[in-house]
Amino acid sequence: MQRLNGRIGHAISRLTHIHPDQSGIYPLSDGLDAFAARMKLADLAEQTLDLQYYIWNKDMSGMLMYSVVQRAADRGVRVRLLLDDNNTRGLDKILLALDQHPNIEVRLFNAFQTRAVRAFSYLTDFARLNRRMHNKSFTIDNQATIIGGRNVGDEYFSAGGEQLFSDLDVLAIGPVVEQVGRDFQRYWDCPSVSLLAQVVPPPRRKNKNTISSKMGQVSVDPHAERYVKRLEQADFFVRLQDGNLPFIWAKTRLLSDDPAKALGQVADKALLTSRLKSVINEPEQRLDIISPYFVPTRAGVEQLIMLAEKGVRVAVLTNSLKANDVAIVHAGYAKWRRTLLQHGIKLYELKRDSVTDRQPRDRGLTGKSGSSLHAKTFSVDSREVFVGSFNFDPRSAMLNTEMGFVIGSEELAETIHGLFIGTLNQNAYEVGLDEHGKMYWREHDGDRVVIHWQEPQTHILERWFIRALYHLPVDWLL
C-alpha cells in the first residue's frame, strides 16, 4: 500500500513512478466516502473533469454534485458531462444552465427526440431506446478516476431517507486511468451521442441562475446541512487529510462495451461478457458473485453448474424479493433457484430491513433503513476481481453498454470476499432445500436462527405475481 497526499498531479506521479506497470486501487464501499471522494477530486481538478453516468438525480446529493461541477468550471476546469437520456426527465433546465457555462459541455446518449411524452417515443422507437448507456465514470485531469456501480443520487450516497442502495466503487490512479480517458472519448464522439442543443430547445431567456436557485433551496435544508457535516467527517476525508489514503497496487485493465452496441452493431465476441471470459481465468476454487439483478438464463445456469461439478464453490449474493426494486427481474432469477441449489450453488438474498436512521452506518455491502443491494462485483479464487456497472442479466450482456475493471489482486479479492462473508450472517437470508426438496430461507436474527418457508416479508399476492412472471418470454429484456 502507498499513500496519496498533496496536489493531485504531483502526488500521483510520484506514486505511479514507483509502480510503473500497476494501478493504485482504493475501494469505496461506504456511501459517504463515495460522495466525499468525488467532491474532493472535483475540487482538486486543474484541467479536465469527464463525467459519464446513467442516472443523475435532481435531489440533494445530485444538486450538491452539480454545484461542485460548476465550481470547477468557474475556476477554469474544462467539464464534459455525458448522460444517458433515459433518466433526465425534469433536468432539461438544469442541463441547459450547465451547458451555457463556457467551460461546460453537456451531451446526451441515445436521446429522446420527444421531451414531453417519452412513453410515446418508446412506442415508436423501441428498438433504439431500449438500449441504454449504463456506464459510470468520474475522471479528473486524466490522473484519477472513480468507476463502479453508483449513479448520482441520494440513495447511492447514504443521503436518502427510507431506501439505501448498498454499492461499490473503486478510486483508481495509474495506467488504467488513461484507458478510461480513451474510452470516454470514444463514447463522447460516437453516433449515439447528441449535443444538448440538438434535442433540448433553448430557453427563452438565460437561465444561468437555475442551479444557484436550486442550491439555495438545498442550502437551507437542515438535512442537507447535516449531510455536509457528515461528509466532512467521512473516512475518505480523514484519511486524505492525514496523508493516509492506502492504495492497493495491481495490474488493472478496463473492459468496456463498444458504444456501437447501442446500435446493435457489435459482434457477440466483442461484447464485454465475451471479453471477460477471455481475460479472467476460469475459477478453480471459489467464485463469489454480487449482483443486484441476477438473471442467469439457461446458458448461465449451465455454466455455473459446470463449475460446481468441477469442485468450485460458487456463491451468489443478490436482492431478496422485498429488497428488489424491479419485481420482474426477481422472477427471472427466482425460477432458477431450485436448479442452482440442487447442484450445490450457494444462494444468499439481502434482507429488506426497517432500521432507524439512528443506527450506526454499516461499512460493508449493506446499509441502514431498508437496504437494497446495488453493488456489481465478482471475485475469482483469491486472485482476480471485477468491479463495474455490469449486472448478471441479459440486459447488461446484450442491450446496455457497460464497463468495469478487472483487477489482479489477491489483497482486493480477499477484501471483497470479506465484505461478502461479513454481509451474509446478519444481513442476508441463506436459501436452501430441506431433505424433502422444500425451499427455505434461513435468517440469523441476533442469536436466533429463524427458518422461513415462504419468501420473507412478502404476502401471498406478491408471490403469486412473481410466479406468474416465470412464464413470460421476457428474459432478454431483463
Feature locations, PLM:
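Charged, low-complexity intrinsically disordered terminal segments
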Residues: 1-134, 140-478
